Regions:
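Acidic/proline-rich low-complexity IDRs
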Residues: 5, 13-16, 57, 61, ...
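Conserved N-terminal glycine/acidic-rich loop preference
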Residues: 12-17, 42-43, 50, 70, ...
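Charged, solvent-exposed alpha-helical segments that act as regulatory interaction surfaces
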Residues: 23, 27, 47-54, 92
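A short, surface-exposed loop/turn module that caps and links secondary-structure elements
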Residues: 39-67
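Enriched for short, Lys/Arg-rich terminal
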Residues: 67-103
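Arg/Lys-rich, positively charged N-terminal/basic patches that mediate binding to nucleic acids
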Residues: 1-36
């Protein structure tokens, strides 16, 4: 299994996205969605990171998290899975710059 590195950018984005839905959906749903994101990273992407095709414009992989409105943006090698961003599935991806990631 690969080690997993989560960027500070990912963490901030996830917290912001979850906070946007808290009033509408409640704490329980928000906690479930957060758990789904982390379970997907730990139980699937860490083992099968190549299960999604690389976006040619970004040079990174995109993975929609089932049961959530979120898409993970990541790269990997044999030793490590690196989660760069998390976005809403309808977000404009053309403005993403991998150089903006804070680790």
């Amino acid at each position: 299994m690969r080690s997993v590195r989560l960027s500070i950018t990912f963490n901030d984005q996830l917290n912001e996205l979850l906070a946007q839905g808290e009033d509408r959906f409640g704490e329980r749903v928000i906690a479930e969605k957060k758990a789904l994101v982390y379970q997907t990273i730990r139980n699937h992407l860490a083992y099968f990171p190549a299960s999604r095709v690389r976006d040619p414009d970004l040079g990174l992989h995109l993975y929609p998290v089932s049961g959530t409105p979120f898409v993970l943006v990541y790269d990997f090698d044999e030793a490590e899975l690196r989660i760069h961003f998390v976005l809403h599935k309808r977000a404009d991806r053309s403005t993403i710059d991998p150089a903006d990631v804070e680790w």
